[in-house]
Amino acid sequence: MEHLLEVKNLSVSIDGPAGEVQAVRDVSFSLKKGEVLAIVGESGCGKSVLCKSIMKLLPPSAKIKEGSICVNGQDITCYREKEMQKLRGRVFSMIFQDPMISLNPTIKIGKQIGEAVVIHNKNYTKEQVNKKVLELMELVGISHPKERYHQYPWQFSGGMRQRCVMAIALAADPDILFADEPTTALDVTIQAQILDLLREIQMKLGTATILVSHDLGVVARVADRVAVMYAGKIVEIGTAEEVYYDPRHPYTWGLMRSLPAFANGKESLYTIPGMPPALIDPPKGDAFACRNEYALNIDYEEMPPMFKITDTHYAATWLLDPRAPQIKSPMGGTAHE
């Protein structure tokens, strides 16, 4: 299947008061039509910067240092703002974390969704715009769209506001939808509804989706593939089944053990010891080594390559090297198995 999106060896840096932060470091992945790829990791690992790099929504202090971004076979790495404006909305669109910040509280919902429709359909009549807005509201599950069309954001619940943001993002039928922590500001019940809606839209429209989250548990119900990020790098990537049921990287083990579902009620919830490294001056070897209870001597000296486990499953850990000792995984089995 042809890839909609291919990112190869992408590195992004951000100039800060203390120096240059290497926010994304040599990241490669691809996305197929209709696929849901979840990118998970701790706050600050580079998930959002990666997505904004692809859409060229980075602040002036950030720059792409190396690598390439191809969409539908076209290299867009060096595209200027005018060229990117033709892609945003139609080729890819984004749902941000906080719907209240994304919406204008002084403008009615129908008009805000309508603005997104008009930007990409300048020849639409008023009637066509209104019809499209109502269709989008129905698509994202907003009941009584004709009445709610005339309401303001403050008259909607948090979950309904997020649905409005989704309607805006879908206004031009994008090929790729970026969902940046879309459930963070919502309670657990509403989180499940929004995730189910994302999956429903993906199946109905064939929209490929990149779902960003810090919670492996959140993405379990919707992802086809999962990429685990740590300190600006993808350290493990595979199908959802492979990453959940056969994780190979010690960081992924830690994330899985941190899920409440793994607690037995008798022990305290597991936490990964230590803190992520400062990316102004990343460590020489494996960035996770100082927090990794299974670290080998080589982890402190040399960055591990991506080791192939299956045709779809890869992990960057020296534990997968044939010369490494057999380490018993806390999830069962060993890193080699």
Language model regions located:
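The feature captures the beta-strand-to-loop junction immediately N-terminal to the Walker
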Residues: 40-41
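Short catalytic/signature loops enriched in Gly
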Residues: 3, 143-146, 239-337
